[in-house]
């Protein structure tokens, strides 16, 4: 297996313009495909997940052109539900941001479509979404294991009264919200259980509004969506930088700045993961906010004990930042780490122990006490982009770190290690 050894880094300094947000890119692509008119998307993320969405849209007859660097996409909308040219199978890799929204959107009208993906995708639960779509009339079959992809979709979704479980993934609610306006009937969506990753719902509502559709949101417990609507292209749309990707650079600034400035997100950003900067501030770093930048300057870091439900992806970065903080850090209410690209709670606990940390892994929390000195280890990445990027921070010590399968960062940030090296002064 390919590996990359990062030598100790003395200082991290400088600015980085972030690649586009994965969450925003794939939502914007789907809405542009469903909309009336042409949309020019700029700062689109070029990554595996986005390529899977683009390939699916192409197979569904959507016309688009990409710039040479794949960060601008001019897409001609379908002016309504997507139509398959006949029976179709779409392979979506391990892209949850493609699988969940497409599973809902392709239940409009009369298609026959199979959605499948990599082996890990077949372990990522989708039963709560399927249950909700069936309540709205959708015909869906599981082709292998009950509650998991691959799925066969045969249309039939008309709207109506729907319940959705919000406790596993906010993407199920996102998928229903984006699909419901195109259903023939009005839809009332009731959320049961605690809604995880609520800020991601704000991204969805924000984008729907940009494409001309507003819905009634009653305290994130009930959403009322008028049926028979259309999405309308905003013409041009700039995808903001990926706030989860920003977390690694901001953390590096907190640990070994200098000052690190990330551009493409800021106080006006719609992504909840910008709140990651507040956590670094609580730990002792200095944060400066602009409309389209966040800067982090080094401070003496101390441990925290926090509920991380609102920023589950960026919270992973705090787990490795904790290696540089004084005391024991506890991250709580993060059960949904277990249903991501890998079981991230298990993976994080396992790899933190390899570098010498004392770790307690609970059902929905992790407790981390750093060692006096970090140990050089080969870090397994579990085909999970965030594991690779999180553990790169270990090199901000006097110990090297070896990352196995470093190219797995292609899911959201193909040139991550090059960018980190550009801003680093070797020890």
From Swiss-Prot:
Listed PANTHER family: AROM/DEHYDROQUINATE SYNTHASE, PENTAFUNCTIONAL AROM POLYPEPTIDE
Pathway membership, UniProt: Metabolic intermediate biosynthesis; chorismate biosynthesis; chorismate from D-erythrose 4-phosphate and phosphoenolpyruvate: step 6/7
UniProt protein name: 3-phosphoshikimate 1-carboxyvinyltransferase
Residues where 3-phosphoshikimate binds: 22-23, 27, 169-171, 197, 313, 336, 340
Record lineage: Bacteria, Pseudomonadati, Pseudomonadota, Gammaproteobacteria, Enterobacterales
UniProt subunit comment: Monomer.
Protein encoded by which gene: aroA
Pfam families for the chain: EPSP_synthase
A single GO cellular-component term on record: cytoplasm
InterPro entries xrefs: Enolpyruvate_Tfrase_dom, Enolpyruvate_Tfrase_sf, EPSP_synthase, EPSP_synthase_CS, RNA3'P_cycl/enolpyr_Trfase_a/b
Highest taxon, organism lineage: Bacteria
Organism: Salmonella typhimurium (strain LT2 / SGSC1412 / ATCC 700720)
Principal place of residence: cytoplasm
Gene Ontology BP annotations: amino acid biosynthetic process; aromatic amino acid family biosynthetic process; chorismate biosynthetic process
Active site: 313
GO terms assigned for molecular function: 3-phosphoshikimate 1-carboxyvinyltransferase activity
Compartmental location: Cytoplasm
Role of this protein: Catalyzes the transfer of the enolpyruvyl moiety of phosphoenolpyruvate (PEP) to the 5-hydroxyl of shikimate-3-phosphate (S3P) to produce enolpyruvyl shikimate-3-phosphate and inorganic phosphate.
Keywords on record: Amino-acid biosynthesis, Aromatic amino acid biosynthesis, Cytoplasm, Transferase
Residues engaged in binding phosphoenolpyruvate: 22, 96, 124, 171, 344, 386, 411
Keyword Methyltransferase: no
Record EC number: 2.5.1.19
Protein family according to the UniProt entry: Belongs to the EPSP synthase family.
């Amino acid at each position: 297996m390919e590996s990359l050894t990062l030598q100790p880094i003395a200082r991290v300094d400088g600015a980085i313009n972030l690649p586009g947000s994965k969450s925003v890119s794939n939502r914007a692509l789907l809405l542009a495909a469903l909309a009336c008119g042409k949309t020019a998307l700029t700062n689109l993320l070029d990554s595996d997940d986005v390529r899977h969405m683009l390939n699916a849209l192409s197979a569904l007859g959507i016309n688009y052109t990409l710039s040479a660097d794949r960060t601008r996409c001019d897409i001609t909308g379908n002016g309504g539900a997507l139509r398959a040219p006949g029976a179709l199978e779409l392979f979506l890799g391990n892209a949850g941001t493609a699988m969940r929204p497409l599973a809902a959107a392709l239940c409009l009208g009369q298609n026959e479509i199979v959605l499948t993906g990599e082996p890990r995708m077949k372990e990522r639960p989708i039963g709560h979404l399927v249950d909700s779509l069936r309540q709205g009339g959708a015909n869906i079959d599981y082709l292998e294991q009950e509650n998991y992809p691959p799925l066969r979709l045969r249309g039939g979704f008309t709207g109506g009264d729907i319940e959705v479980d919000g406790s596993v993934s906010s993407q199920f609610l996102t998928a229903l919200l984006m699909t419901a306006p195109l259903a023939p009937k009005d839809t009332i969506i009731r959320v049961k259980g605690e809604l995880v990753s609520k800020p991601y719902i704000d991204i969805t509502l924000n984008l729907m509004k940009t494409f001309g559709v507003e819905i009634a949101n009653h305290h994130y417990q009930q959403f009322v969506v008028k049926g028979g609507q259309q999405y309308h292209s905003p013409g041009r749309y700039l995808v903001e930088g990926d706030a989860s990707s920003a977390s690694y650079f901001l953390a590096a600034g907190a640990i070994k700045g200098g000052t690190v400035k990330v551009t493409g997100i800021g106080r006006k950003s719609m992504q909840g993961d910008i709140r990651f900067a507040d956590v670094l501030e609580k730990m002792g770093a200095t944060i400066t906010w602009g409309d389209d930048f966040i800067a982090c300057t080094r401070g003496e870091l101390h441990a925290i004990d926090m509920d991380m439900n609102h920023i589950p992806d960026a919270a992973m970065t705090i787990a490795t930042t904790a290696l540089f903080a004084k005391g024991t850090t506890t991250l709580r209410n993060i059960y949904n780490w277990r249903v991501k690209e890998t079981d991230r709670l298990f993976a994080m606990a396992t790899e933190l122990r390899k570098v010498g940390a004392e770790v307690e892994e609970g059902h929905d929390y992790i407790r981390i006490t750093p060692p006096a000195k970090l140990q050089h280890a080969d870090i397994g990445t579990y085909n999970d982009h965030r594991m690779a990027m999180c553990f790169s921070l270990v090199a901000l010590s006097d110990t090297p770190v070896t990352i196995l399968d470093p190219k797995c960062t292609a899911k959201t940030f193909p040139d991550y290690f090059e960018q980190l090296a550009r801003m680093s002064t070797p020890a």
